[in-house]
Amino acid sequence: VTYAIADPGSDQAADVARSKRPVKVHDLAMKATGTGKLELAKTGTEAFSLLGVSWTEDAKRLKGTAQVRTRSVETGEWSGWQNLDVDEAHPVDRAEPGAQDAHGGSEPLWVGPSDGVEARVVAADGSGSTGLPKGLEVNLVDPGVTAAEAKNKALDTSGEGGAGTGTNTGTGSDMDAAAFVAEDPSASPSDPGSASPSESPVPTAEPSPTDTPTDTPTETPAVTDSPSASASPSESTSPSPTESTSPSPSPTVPTAPPSTVRQPPVISRAQWGADESTVDDPAEYIDKVSAVFVHHTAGTNNYSCAESAQLVRGIMAYHIQVEGWNDLGYNFLVDKCGQVFEGRAGGIDLPVRGAHTFGFNADSAGIAVLGDFEGNPNATPPKPAGKPTRATLESVARVAAWKLGQYGGNPTGKVTLTAAADTGVWKAGEQATLSTVSGHRDAFATACPGQNLYGKLAEIRRYAASAGKNSAIPTADVNRDGISDLVAGTPGASGGVGSVTLVPGGLNGPVPASKRTLTQSSPGVPGDSEAGDNWGAATAWGDINGDGNADLAVGAPGEDDTSGHADRGSVTVLYGPALNSGFSYATSGVTSTGAKLGSAVTAGDFNADGKADVFAAGTGKGGHWNARLTDGATQTGTLTTSTSAIAYPDATTGDFNRDGYADVALNYRDAGGIGRVTWFKGGASGLTKVSTLSVKGGRSIAAGDVNGNGYDDLVIGQPYTSESGAVSGGQVTMVPGTSTGFTTTGMATIQQDTSGVPGANESGDALGSSVSVGDYNLDGYADVLAGAPNEDITRDAVNRSNPGTAILLKGTSAGLTGSGAIAVSQDTSGVPGSTETDDKLGSAVSLTDLTGYGRTDLTLGTEGEDAGDGILLYVPSNSTGLGLTQTAILSKSQLGTATRARLGQLLTP
């Protein structure tokens, strides 16, 4: 078949565009008009990605409306008007160095790479410029490009690197294109966009902007590789989770106290590209962190986590060069993916005085979440409030618990602080009794951190007091660029030698130009490539050494040991980002010959010690399980009392009882041919085998919070009647998690005769052969993607046998539903290719965010395509729904997989 493919292309032009450059700030004065407004007419500018308005009177608020519209570098089109958050503005702490020269300002707004701006400000009472603060200007911030970002093809949206087209963003965000800036910022640009229908075009103004570029280039040092390890069961010492170095104790620098809570991985200022030359005065310190205040940065929720470092650089430049602060105001920042960034300089383990909560900075630490969780329903168009993700809430809780743990603070308790100034909530000198973890609005007259984030503070406090506060942050991001990465296992490649192919995620989706193929012959990979090893039969991501990078666990059930035990099986762990060091291990505690360890693999922090552990299962002699904890301890056991082999094991990780420890659910077919699911409960000492569910197993299993109640739920793919009691065409069953484990209350089973589900139940379709869980529409409920690789499809009156289909099922507060389900096949409009006999689309599925925007995208394995070479179909999830017309195909020619390797039979996550 002939089809459109994701062309890796030539990267020469893109590499030129991705040039390193420093942060710059451009200031444009606003002028009074006869309409009683202050305006900046449409103006061509140098590149910027973040903007705001500021004024010279720090103590004065802008009582009115400030609006901006910008021109996209990528499309050349003008955006609609966007309101700036002027209500969030607050005066700088008088103790802040240089506070006497500070300016007032709106919250900065991230707009993505732009090269034109228009702005208008009007007083709330319509009194014109006399009712507005003095010295109003528009401030444009170009966050620059670091050396590491310049080299990362995943951050290229020029069409050279990614599989998609870049329309996932909704903002035309392209860090690389921003290097192409207007040579003359005062020139009159062409206006491909148009004003709103009720407006007449505004002539281009010609102001003389005052540029305030930083002199020191922004450069991110390369992340150091994990320490090497031999191909032995002993792991290497794990590195520090952050490269931030605190200053040595001195008369002005305190000693960092130990914490009762493990420090989470933090992206240091050096790593995200802070320009220290712009910080005039050294850090100041408070006596102790008695409280933690949670903030939001307002602005936008439409950013990729690959852009978070740019956003943080932009906020730092705005705080320093626009508002006149000494440094970034917050102590820490957290993005929608749960990445934690070091904020104000001075040492993350020290009590650095921030500038985040006016009146209470002398007693607290400030954590800001990137995003707007208040919204503005009165804006035109209305601006919706964002919903904080689970990853965000848990990372905020980890940081809060760690900082409070240094000083004996209780994250669920209360604290009494003395207000240092009038804040609109408290009078100067008043004793304020607050929750130890509070929102900004509890201390200062503001909407911050927004209604939706404020409403989740109780959950942050709960998690900060649970075992989860010490747990590893779940990740599939091998190089820590903010985007999850995909792994395709091909265990049958090269006569059963086996291989895995890593396809990095990017702003446009998967980046085939940066793919990596690994075998046991690859440098640094333990073991040797041998026929029948089936290396890659199962894979899993997890931060196993605690450095913040995802590490890869690979199962090889056909591995023979050196003592003559055939098919003993093994698991290999490779440390990210390089994946060229690690260790491997085999079975213990069970019969070695035929054990086939590595038939199923998953990873999670079972003992909540800050490092992910590895769970593996083997099929030999009734089946067995093996949990490899990060201290090298191993837990093992059998699955059944039979001496015959089990089959089709598949494992998933989730916190099903919400106690903060990762649990495991293992699916398999027992020796009697019946599908089973066994629950292993996490705890301080690792995993405990709890029970086998009454609900039958099938061929696939996945976990996620489908009903949005905070407990991970179990999703079981049940394609066959004889194994699972399923309908003839297969089905998907969701089993809710609760504080005591799983329950059948609220359980839902969906098949193709369920109302709302496309198609019809037909014998042999095998719906549920593969399942994956993720939130494709960012509504807070995990959705389910299920494969039916044996689905027959009729096209042009001709039936095709087993071309396959995938069905997207939606999560709701009531659980899994068939309502609104979406089917995708190669006959779906917009999807390249066409259905063919035995293509088997849906042989594997992955519902994973491969762009960093928070919505999980669809990756569909089609293992039978091209006579068994196999392909992957990538379908982006956009703000308006599935981007079917942007579907890209990744095939043998892009990924370099072996002939007849059946690419698409296994996908991780």
Where are these regions (language model features)?
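Blade-edge motifs of beta-propeller repeat domains
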Residues: 467-472, 504-534, 572-596, 627-647, ...
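Hydrophobic strand positions within the blades of repeat-based beta-sheet folds
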Residues: 486-488, 500-503, 518, 535, ...
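Beta-sandwich interaction modules
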Residues: 35-47, 66-67, 72, 78-132
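Beta-propeller blade termini
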Residues: 471-480, 536-544, 598-606, 649-656, ...
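Short glycine/acidic-enriched loop and turn motifs that connect beta-strands
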Residues: 491-495, 558-563, 620-623, 669-673, ...
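Basic/polar, cationic surfaces and motifs that engage anionic cell-wall
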Residues: 136-213, 221-223, 227-230, 244-286, ...
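Acidic/hydrophobic-patterned starts of short beta strands in beta-sheet-rich repeat architectures
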Residues: 481-489, 546-555, 608-617, 658-667, ...
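A detector of repeated loop/turn-to-beta-strand junctions in beta-rich toroidal repeat architectures
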Residues: 496-499, 512, 551, 565-570, ...
